[in-house]
Amino acid sequence: MNYEKLHSKYKNSSIQGRYLNLNSIESFSEFWKTKNKLEILGLSVQARPIYKFQIGSGTTKILMWSQMHGNESTTTKGLVDFMNVLQSNSEIAKAILKEYTFCIIPMLNPDGAFSYKRVNANEVDLNRDFQNLSQPESQILMQ
């Protein structure tokens, strides 16, 4: 398997730079919705939607999320590329989707992404909020 060819084939080149906010991924939402299950799980502190994309029919369920820290967008870019692979109808994608069901939250902290900050709009680091679950974003992730 040639990973460089796979990367160049499925990489979303429209997402560039370090600053990635909700508008960047919402442009793909209609495409995701038409091919698979896309839903809004809830809203952030500043009422921005938190999306979940679901694909696959396998018995093993995998939860993936990105941008828990709003200013860390690298994984979001990787998830978008991975979602492109899963929707490609390739033999690899078919085999993966037969075994697994993926639930993907491409941006957990859209308020932090908007302001390019690690924390959410209430100045809470969501990665430190798993015990208290004081923030709507943390509560959404734990549903």
Identify the role of each PLM range.
Residues 51-59, 67:
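Short beta-strand-to-loop junctions in surface cap/lid or active-site-entrance loops
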Residues 1-50:
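Short glycine- and acidic-rich boundary segments immediately preceding or forming the N-terminal edge
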